[in-house]
């Protein structure tokens, strides 16, 4: 099973420590199954979706912040159309304040 931890950063020069920490936390046995993908908010929705689709994850996690939340919401709408069997997980400060509400709004999301 392939896991994709995804960050959408504010700038190309930024990186997201959360996805690196999560991958490190799974342990050496599982690390080969965890891939990281970093994009920026300046990339098009189509480009990001293509980058995700090429990796063919079975499970994808998004690190959600104020600067990327609008774009991630768009991705959540489109992603099930191209990867219908992929589980979607959300984390970060933009999704932890109202998990039940977000799960109602985005039924395609597996969990927070």
Model regions and ranges:
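Nucleotide-activated donor-dependent transferases that construct or modify glycoconjugates
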Residues: 1-11, 59
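Glycine-rich beta-alpha loop elements in corrinoid/cobalamin-binding modules
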Residues: 18, 25, 33-112
């Amino acid at each position: 099973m392939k896991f994709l931890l995804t960050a959408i950063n504010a700038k190309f020069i930024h990186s997201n420590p959360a996805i690196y920490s999560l991958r490190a936390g799974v342990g050496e046995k599982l690390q080969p199954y965890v891939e990281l993908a970093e994009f920026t908010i300046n990339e098009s929705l189509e480009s990001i979706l293509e980058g995700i689709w090429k990796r063919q994850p079975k499970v994808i996690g998004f690190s959600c912040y104020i600067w990327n939340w609008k774009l991630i919401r768009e991705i959540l709408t489109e992603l099930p159309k191209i990867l219908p069997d992929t589980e979607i997980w959300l984390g970060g400060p933009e999704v932890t304040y109202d998990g039940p509400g977000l799960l109602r709004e985005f039924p395609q999301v597996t969990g927070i």
